[in-house]
Amino acid sequence: DGNKALLGYAWSGNWYFHISKQGRILVGQTKKMFTKMLEPKQELKTPSVLIAFCNKEEKRSLVSHLHQFLKKYWIPNNSASRELMVEWNHWWTYEDVEINEEVFLRNVDVAHELGIELCTLDAGWYGDTKTHWSKQQGDWKLVNKEKFPNGLRYLADYVHDRGMKFGIWLEPEALGFYSKLRKDNQVIEALIDGNAYESPYICLGNPDGARLIYQFITDLVEKTNADFIKLDFNLDPEYGCNRIDHGHGQGDGLFQHYREYYRILDAVRERFPNLIIENCASGG
């Protein structure tokens, strides 16, 4: 009849959509490899479902309806929600191979001349030069002094002195295959039937893992005085962790992982109310 509806499952983990021929719609948590045991009187809050509707006479699109709702009720009210900044990010041009202090600062000068408002340091600032950036996540305390001899705060101060904002990239959940963190702290790793995932990651359903992630983010923001942080996630968590020594159930590891991730983001937002947090997943 020309009327339109939009549904979105407000959830970062696995989900399930079923639309019948009769027009009935079922939306929710995937049933595959998911179980959640509740104790007597224990409650479980399920993820939200976003629904937008407009009739054929309306000129505004469904996306416009959704954007207005998110802007009014969901997105934090800070400088980024009012007007996005023009950003320079070193990725794709230099990636992790060619970026270093001299290259970054030279581009900051160009960005300043062009009126760009935000300069972001992407992957490649941690670990050692010989190992690929995707194999060292987790070693966030090990700043690559070969590439950045004066440290990250020096870069941030250089950017701030020119009236621009400083941003930095982080993939906090990822656990690089060759990282020192993975070698020294195996208790935090997400496992499936006792085996590591092809792309290892930290299970946030484990309290130690969650505390570590919060510390990674807050320490990096404080030490660099960052205005903007880009949180990436370049892996598939698949069905999550089913370890029985993590504090979550055997069938709800991924569910608890994302519940805790949202709690961490809320805590970071409370601590740094003006921090701009960008959600990124392999660039998307």
Where do the protein language model's features map onto the residues?
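N-terminal accessory beta-strand-rich subdomains and adjacent acidic, glycine-rich linkers
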Residues: D1-Y73
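Aromatic- and glycine-enriched glycan-recognition loops and surfaces
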Residues: Q29, T93-K183, I188-A190, R211-Q215, ...
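Feature activates predominantly on carbohydrate-active enzymes
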Residues: K4, W11-W15, Q22-R24, Q29, ...
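Hydrophobic faces of well-ordered beta-strands that scaffold small-molecule active sites
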Residues: L84-H90, E117-L121, F166-L170, I229-L231, ...
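Terminal accessory/anchoring regions of large secretory-pathway or extracellular enzymes
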Residues: N55-V86, D96-V97, F104-V108, L114, ...
